[in-house]
């Protein structure tokens, strides 16, 4: 009986915890983004070996956010975390032109997974504060995003260190998740 009332309460007040994965190649800024979202400031990070998991509350929605390491040796284990994922934040280093093809390959492989079929995709074109950064449009084309017909997606111009673009991206994600319920 208590479970019934708590589920009604949750549906009325939006307290269901959403599962979000933050994925991308190593050095893209995933961990910086996670802690910027959680504590609102830049924290010193080291390369993630394995994962970081934190609860982030944004606009009355609770997110269980999983930041998975992006090194070549860790990427095959991403699939172990796909189950019950509501959205993927895919972070791309806008300055890393040499690895945009690898980033695309990882993104395509991930999106082919059945467990992520219904997950919303948010791409963070990160490090936009750098002069040599690709534009979000250039990145979207390089990643093949316009070809995604059966998936809700959006790309945002972000800088994890400056905090720019994160609110817009999270606002879009929250509204998109709410419209699905």
Swiss-Prot record:
CDD domains: Arl1. The keyword GTP-binding applies. Disulfide bonds: none annotated. GTP binds at residues 24-31, 45-48, 70, 126-129, 160-161. It is found in: Golgi apparatus membrane; Golgi apparatus, trans-Golgi network membrane; Membrane. SUPFAM superfamilies: P-loop containing nucleoside triphosphate hydrolases. Mg(2+) binds at residues 31, 48. Belongs to the small GTPase superfamily. Arf family. This is ADP-ribosylation factor-like protein 1. InterPro entries: P-loop_NTPase, Small_GTP-bd, Small_GTPase_ARF, Small_GTPase_ARF/SAR. The lineage of its organism: Eukaryota, Metazoa, Chordata, Craniata, Vertebrata. The keyword tRNA processing does not apply. A lipid is attached at residue 2 (N-myristoyl glycine). Keywords: Golgi apparatus, GTP-binding, Lipoprotein, Magnesium, Membrane, Metal-binding, Myristate, Nucleotide-binding. Pfam families: Arf (PF00025). GO terms for biological process: Golgi organization; intracellular protein transport; protein localization to Golgi apparatus; retrograde transport, endosome to Golgi; toxin metabolic process; vesicle-mediated transport. It is a peripheral membrane protein; Lipid-anchor. The GTP-bound form interacts with GOLGA1. The GTP-bound form interacts with GOLGA4 and RGPD8. The GTP-bound form directly interacts with ARFIP2. Binds to SCOC, preferentially in its GTP-bound form. May interact with UNC119. Interacts with ARFIP1; this interaction directs ARFIP1 to the trans-Golgi membranes. Interacts with ARFGEF1 (via N-terminus). One of its GO terms (molecular function) is metal ion binding.
